[in-house]
UniProtKB/Swiss-Prot annotation:
One protein family per Pfam: DAGK_acc
Residue span(s) of domain EF-hand: 108-143, 153-188
Cited InterPro entries: ATP-NAD_kinase_N, C1-like_sf, C1_DGKalpha_rpt2, DAG_kinase_typeI_N, DGK, DGK_typeI_N_sf, Diacylglycerol_kin_accessory, Diacylglycerol_kinase_cat_dom
Chief location bin: cytoplasm
Similarity comment text for this entry: Belongs to the eukaryotic diacylglycerol kinase family.
Enzyme class: transferase
Regulation: Stimulated by calcium and phosphatidylserine. Activated by sphingosine.
GO cellular component, one term: plasma membrane
UniProt protein name: Diacylglycerol kinase alpha
Localization terms from the record: Cytoplasm, Cytosol
Gene name per UniProt: Dgka
GO terms (BP aspect): diacylglycerol metabolic process; glycerolipid metabolic process; intracellular signal transduction; lipid phosphorylation; phosphatidic acid biosynthetic process; phospholipase C-activating G protein-coupled receptor signaling pathway
A molecular-function term among this protein's GO annotations: alkylglycerol kinase activity
Pathway in which this enzyme or protein is active: Lipid metabolism; glycerolipid metabolism
Organism: Rattus norvegicus (Rat)
Length: 727
């Protein structure tokens, strides 16, 4: 640790962030139960105490020694420590630790800037001297390398940037100078790892970007350089050199109408450059973008034209090919602009334009504005990338980062007629949004489409949105949403009633079933995977690693058969009728609402719907049959997520699950199709609901129909359409 003292590397920070993402505790919760008397002396804590604190905070049995020591050292103001001489005599300030983790959990850029100042102010004198400023520059250089920036010319830019902060010429930077300058100095925010979020209009949302084609700075009009990096605004695609960002013109994107005259009519908003198609949409001739900053693009309709063709294009913008989804700025305005009595009634509680309630929305007629929710943690870095793309192709005020929950977005859209919802994330994210919409009590419930991120995505597969997003054109996906059909998804209430025998269970992850519920072998594998991922999140950072871990746990389960003879410890009632399992040897029972689980495995199997049978049930029974157990009739039953019925399937073991997944076997044991199920268990068993596993002590489980939610079914697949139902 002799080199780079006081610094935590980007790699270490990324590893720490993964641990925090999986932890359920806040730093305040930990400090309430932490043994202060044992590990602390006043406001000081030693290495052993810090290690114990991290274990409690991150909810792990062991923290990697390198990470723990590096983090401990980053809080230390002394310069004579090394790893070989660590002891309880080496102490750090507990309040600094509290501040650091509190800010990681959430905080404004200003708060994070203030904390960063205090972290680098090693002598605690309230100013940053030249040595401390050099440490900050070194840290930013390391982050730049981690972001794959070209750092060959970055140091003098950063030095000049830091010098400009010293407004009084004292040779030092005060806290006030640091916060005032830092909040508006884009490279500083990016390189310190501080997220930039949308404030009010006029602010660029910068992100570092390496350019694979010749591009030119919108400010100085000089080339960025092929393969070099600069900063690109997510909202308007304004591009600048790193050192030009502070002088850049305000962002041209106005996300809402500022005056009454702006309401109702949307003009084009032109930004120079950004003509990536290379062809003018007006005259169809080439736009020569390789030699200079040339051409114009509209940030709303995305037309690309020559500078000379501007006069031939009318002033009014129709929002282009995606007009059905876009809320143009002219349709969003502050409620304070509403005249008369309506204004008095609706503005009494409005104190800030930062709240959804401060705006009124009147969408363009015959459109279906899209409310987009994105889970930035889904699919590795996919979520963040999708967020950036949607901020450009739609109005940024339609796009919501789920780190703040879905409520702000739903409140913003609560009075918007005929809107749709797009959820970008996994099945868990979709379930979260559906539950929140259900509780919001909309008079007309909006239909929900899914852009699947990450692995699994069983519901997205069944709705024809594919097994996972892999960088496809988002405009194509939005056009598919336009022609999608509304279907209704049954949702089921899961009631777990523990027996009064004193045995403790894990918390039940959800009281709602959207996809499936299972007991036994598959839940056992999922539970072991879940525990290992919580303990060692750094080992589960790719799809391939996840699959290998599942394979290892499945192999182990096939050897030990922990759920063998499940029928001896579980009884099943369907609509009050006891299901006979005596002739079967099962290790798992699955209750299916959709024909996909485990990332595309169809345990029920494929069935051709009988001619004229619209309900997936033999015509002789009629469409009102609530329970079917006859094996011959079950052969003709087709799964339907809208029929208010569940399919019950028995699983012989891990080998059978693998055979079904690989299509070597068509299905598991079809046990029943019914509208109500009750399980009685006599021992602790692994269970899972929609992929979330837990261990459950003996209990009674009741599954009953709750309601239906409108979902959007993607268009029928073609041979070249990825977003078909691939299992």
């Amino acid at each position: 640790m002799a080199k780079d003292k006081g610094l935590i590397s980007p790699e270490d920070f990324a590893q720490l962030q993964k641990y925090i993402d999986y932890s359920t505790k806040s730093v305040s919760d930990v400090l309430k139960v932490f043994e202060m008397n044992k590990y602390c002396q006043g406001d000081e804590i030693g290495y052993l105490g810090f290690e114990q604190f991290l274990k409690m905070y991150l909810e792990v049995e062991e923290v990697p020694h390198h990470l723990c020591w590096t983090l401990f050292w980053s809080f230390h103001s002394s310069q004579d420590l090394d790893e070989e001489t660590e002891s309880k005599a080496n102490v750090i300030c507990l309040s600094d630790v509290y501040c650091y983790f509190t800010l990681l959990e959430g905080g404004s850029p200003e708060d994070k800037l203030e904390f960063t100042f205090k972290l680098y102010d090693m002598d605690r004198n309230g100013i940053l001297d030249s040595t401390e400023v050099e440490k900050i520059i070194l840290q930013m250089m390391r982050v730049a390398e981690y972001l794959d920036w070209d750092v060959s010319e970055l140091r003098p830019i950063l030095q000049e940037m830091m010098k400009e902060m010293d407004r009084d010429g004292s040779g030092c930077v005060s806290l006030a100078e640091w916060v005032r300058a830092g909040a508006t100095t884009v490279p500083l925010l990016v390189l310190l790892g501080i997220d930039m979020t949308m404030k009010d209009d006029g602010h660029h949302i910068w992100r570092p970007k390496r350019f694979s084609r010749p591009v030119y700075c919108n400010l100085c009009e000089l080339s960025i350089g092929l393969g070099k990096q600069g900063l690109s605004c997510n909202l308007c695609k304004y591009i600048v050199h790193d050192h030009c960002a502070m002088k850049a013109q305000p962002c041209e994107v106005s996300t809402y109408a500022k005056s009454r005259k702006d309401i109702g009519v949307q003009p084009h908003v032109w930004v120079r450059g950004g003509c990536h198609s290379g062809r003018c949409d007006r005259c169809q001739k080439k736009i020569r973008t390789y030699h200079s900053l040339t051409g114009l693009h509209c940030v709303w309709c995305h037309l690309e034209i020559h500078d000379d063709c501007l006069q031939a294009v009318g002033p009014e913008c129709d929002c282009g090919l995606l007009r059905d989804h876009i809320l143009p700025p002219c349709s969003i305005y502050p409620r304070v602009l509403v005249s008369g009595q309506e204004c008095k009634q609706k503005t009494t509680d409005v104190t800030s334009l930062c709240t959804p309630e401060a705006f009124r929305i009147e969408p363009v007629s015959n459109t279906h504005p899209l409310l987009v929710f994105i889970n930035p943690k889904s699919g590795g870095k996919q979520g963040q990338s999708v967020l950036w793309k949607f901020q450009y192709i739609l109005n940024p005020r339609q796009v919501f980062n789920l780190k703040d929950g879905p409520e702000p977005g739903l409140r913003f859209f609560k009075d918007v007629p005929q809107f749709r919802v797009l959820v970008c994330g996994g099945d868990g994210t979709v379930g979260w949004i559906l539950e929140t919409i259900d509780k919001a009590n909309f008079p007309i419930v909006p239909p929900v489409a899914v852009l699947p991120l990450g692995t699994g995505n069983d519901l997205a597969r069944c709705l024809r949105w594919g097994r996972g997003y892999e960088g496809e054109n988002l405009r194509k996906i939005l056009k598919d949403i336009e022609i999608s059909k509304v279907v209704y998804l049954d949702r089921w209430l899961l009631e777990v009633i523990p027996q009064q025998n004193g045995e403790k269970s894990d918390p039940v992850p959800s009281q709602i079933i959207n996809n499936y519920f299972s007991i036994g072998v598959d839940a056992s594998i999922a539970h072991r995977f879940h525990l290992m991922r919580e303990k060692y999140p750094e080992k589960f950072n790719s799809r391939m690693k996840n699959k290998l871990w599942y394979l290892e746990f499945a192999t182990s389960e096939s050897i030990f058969s922990t759920c063998k003879k499940l029928e001896e410890s579980v009884t099943v009632e369907i609509c009050g009728k006891l299901l006979d399992l005596s002739d079967l040897s099962l290790e798992g029972i699955a209750v299916l609402n959709i024909p996909s689980m485990h990332g595309g495995s169809n345990l029920w199997g494929d069935t051709k719907r009988p001619h004229g049978d619209t309900c997936g049930i033999n015509q002789a029974l009629g469409s009102v049959a609530k329970i079917i157990t006859d094996p011959d009739i079950l052969k003709t039953c087709v799964p339907d997520m809208s029929d208010k019925r569940l399919e019950v399937v028995g699983i012989e073991g891990v080998i059978e699950m693998g055979q079904i997944y690989t299509r070597l076997k068509s299905a598991g044991h079809r046990l029943a199709k019914c509208s109500e199920i009750t399980f009685q268990t006599t021992k602790t068993l692994p269970m899972q609901v929609d992929g979330e596993p837990w261990m459950q002590a003996p209990c009674t489980i009741k599954i009953t129909h709750k309601n239906q939610m409108p979902m959007l079914m993607g268009p029928a697949p073609s041979s070249s359409n990825f977003f078909g139902f691939w299992s």
